[in-house]
Design a protein with these regions (language model features):
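Flavin-dependent oxidoreductase catalytic core characteristic
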Residues: 1-169
């Protein structure tokens, strides 16, 4: 959702910070969403046991349908390389701004949900350190850690979304 909001705001306002955020979030949303879709569909086959491979359950078709999604619009590996390459040409400024935002929301949650807020803070600090390390590397060296970096970023953003949802409850 935050990716869609960033895209809409970038389109509506033309502001550089929204454009940078939309650009940063797009490969994360695409790759993480499709990776999770594959995992969930494979679990669907698994929970059906041997019947998961039988067409009548529908699980095998879901699995086949999901499997192509990490390939559409650039494979997820390419999306990750885009994240650490083109999307970090600003020395990680857009990434650091987003991490700062996560940490501000985490700070606001410490009184109400100290354990969860502490975990999200710790994860966001690890992401900050990974981002600092990533932007310090030459471009070609960044690619080796691109996929794990994208996954870490997605998990921190997901944790932040869950923290905000828990606060709204």
């Amino acid at each position: 959702l935050s990716c869609a909001v960033a895209i809409d705001m970038a389109t509506a306002t033309g502001r550089a910070e929204w454009q940078a955020r939309a650009a940063l979030l797009t490969p994360i949303a695409k790759a993480h969403g499709t990776d999770i879709g594959c995992e969930v569909s494979h679990l669907g086959v698994q929970i059906h046991g041997g019947m998961g491979f039988i067409e009548e359950t529908g699980a095998a078709q879901f699995s086949r349908d999901a499997r192509i999604t990490p390939i559409y619009e650039g494979t997820n590996g390419i999306q990750a390389m885009d994240l650490v390459g083109r999307k970090m040409q600003d020395n990680g400024d857009a990434a650091f701004r987003l991490i700062d935002e996560v940490q501000r929301s985490t700070e606001g949650a410490r009184a109400t949900l100290p354990d969860l807020a502490g975990d999200v803070w710790q994860a966001s600090e690890a992401l900050r350190e990974a981002t600092e390390a990533m932007v310090a590397l030459p471009l070609n060296d960044r690619f080796a850690g691109a996929v794990p970096y994208l996954r870490a970023f997605a998990r921190v953003l997901g944790a932040d979304a869950h923290l905000k949802a828990a606060l709204a409850d």
